Amino acid sequence: MAKTSQVNRNKRREKMAARDAAKRAALKAIVNDRSLPVEDRFDATLKLAQLPRNGAKTRVRLRCELTGRARGNYRKFKLCRVALRDLASAGQIPGMVKSSW
């Protein structure tokens, strides 16, 4: 089980990233638009730099929903490999069966 402070920090970052996503996308579109004057693009760069860093999507870490483990996660299930194996062998994940050939 991961530290609750790490899990809570990541959840706070997820909320901030969702809240700031539209604003960041608009500013990035202005910065990358070559048809606009340099001054406008530079102002957009400064505004983008003023936004909190924790609001960036890249700061969010994919963690297991059950254990909070940060490594060895499957995106499709939002579970770490350990929790996925336990749930799958217990028959808790519909459609997932142990492979044999």
From Swiss-Prot:
InterPro entries: Ribosomal_uS14, Ribosomal_uS14_bac/plastid, Ribosomal_uS14_CS. Residues 1-20 are annotated as: Disordered. Keywords: Ribonucleoprotein, Ribosomal protein, RNA-binding, rRNA-binding. It holds the Pfam family Ribosomal_S14. GO terms for biological process: translation. The keyword 4Fe-4S does not apply. One of its GO terms (cellular component) is small ribosomal subunit. One of its GO terms (molecular function) is rRNA binding. PROSITE patterns: RIBOSOMAL_S14 (PS00527). Binds 16S rRNA, required for the assembly of 30S particles and may also be responsible for determining the conformation of the 16S rRNA at the A site. Part of the 30S ribosomal subunit. Contacts proteins S3 and S10. Belongs to the universal ribosomal protein uS14 family. HAMAP family: Ribosomal_uS14_1. This is Small ribosomal subunit protein uS14. It comes from Acidiphilium cryptum (strain JF-5). The gene is rpsN.
